[in-house]
């Protein structure tokens, strides 16, 4: 169990680094940048609690998954709402956000015991919609050589698709092998999570390099004047 847990902590560490990088460079950035900053910081808090509880009491941290998926869905829905320029896409994102939240409120009201378990409907709805939003954004900007948040959207698709496939296949408790250490499907999910964080880091570097280039161009123009 130790090796997969170390891999999980590695993902948590990269998440912390990304959160710090975005937080330290958030000044004078746009609303989208601020959303990602808040998303990463609060995600780190949730993941930290999940790892601590999971380490000391395995299997008792399922309730935290609801906060993870719902917060991620709300934060990234706001992100894509502001990222899209098409008014129809904006309305679709807004209506889907309201509809999903209403469905889940009714579901938890009628079945409160779901709070202590994985809610597969919650996971499927929130993950699939975010994957669709990211795919739409990538398709609409496919011909553009450079665009903000392409790395993030690619990472989001890869990570959510991998975790969603685990839930849809019903392999949440499946073990691949036990020697020399226990390895289950969540190990691979952790690897994809690290890849996701790496692409977020590349997004941060791309966004800030772009700003530095713009500042340099402004300085050059002023010198010419």
Question: Which stretches of residues belong to each language-model region?
Answer:
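Terminal, non-globular segments
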Residues: 1-225
């Amino acid at each position: 169990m130790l090796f997969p847990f170390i891999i999980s902590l590695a993902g948590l560490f990269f998440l912390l680094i990304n959160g710090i990088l975005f937080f330290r460079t958030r000044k004078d950035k746009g609303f989208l940048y601020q959303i990602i900053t808040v998303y990463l910081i609060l995600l780190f808090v949730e993941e930290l609690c999940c790892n601590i509880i999971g380490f000391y009491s395995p299997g008792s941290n399922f309730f935290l998954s609801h906060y993870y998926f719902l917060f991620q869905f709300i934060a990234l829905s706001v992100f894509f709402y502001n990222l899209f320029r098409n008014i129809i896409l904006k309305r679709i994102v807004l209506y889907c956000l309201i509809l999903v939240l209403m469905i889940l409120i009714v579901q938890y009201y009628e079945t409160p015991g779901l709070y202590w378990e994985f809610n597969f409907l919650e996971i499927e709805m929130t993950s699939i919609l975010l994957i669709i939003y990211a795919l739409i954004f990538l398709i609409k900007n496919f011909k553009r050589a450079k665009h903000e948040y392409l790395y993030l959207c690619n990472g989001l698709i890869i990570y959510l698709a991998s975790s969603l496939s685990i839930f849809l296949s019903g392999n949440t408790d499946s073990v691949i092998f036990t020697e020399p250490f226990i390895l289950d499907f969540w190990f691979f999910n952790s690897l994809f999570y690290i890849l996701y964080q790496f692409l977020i880091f590349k997004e941060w570097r791309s966004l800030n390099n772009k700003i530095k280039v713009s500042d340099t161009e402004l300085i050059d123009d002023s010198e010419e004047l």
